[in-house]
Amino acid sequence: MRLLVCLVFLASFAMVCQGHSSGYTRPLRKPSRPIFIRPIGCDVCYGIPSSTARLCCFRYGDCCHLG
């Protein structure tokens, strides 16, 4: 009997981990805001003007440290 209870628990836990809840799975929702693609200057900060670095910092939150 303990083995049966353990197997049922493990099966239900596996279903929860896979996203099943009460036998119904909802479709994935789209993100509420659009995903912006960052310009390459935000990731590679060598040789870009300081105004571009500031723009990336304000718009995308990626602050380039020029040095």
From Swiss-Prot:
Domain of life: Eukaryota
InterPro entries given in the database record: Penaeidin (IPR009226)
Reported function: Antibacterial and antifungal activity. Presents chitin-binding activity.
Similarity comment text for this entry: Belongs to the penaeidin family.
UniProt source species: Penaeus setiferus
GO molecular function: chitin binding
Keywords of the record: Amidation, Antibiotic, Antimicrobial, Chitin-binding, Disulfide bond, Fungicide, Signal
Pfam families in UniProt: Penaeidin (PF05927)
Compartment(s) where it occurs, according to its Swiss-Prot or TrEMBL record: Cytoplasmic granule
Gene Ontology process terms (BP): defense response to bacterium; defense response to fungus; killing of cells of another organism
Cysteine disulfide partners in this protein: C42-C56, C45-C63, C57-C64
GO cellular component, one term: cytoplasm
Main location per the UniProt record: cytoplasm
Signal peptide: 1-19
Name by which UniProt lists this protein: Penaeidin-4d
Modified residues (Leucine amide): L66
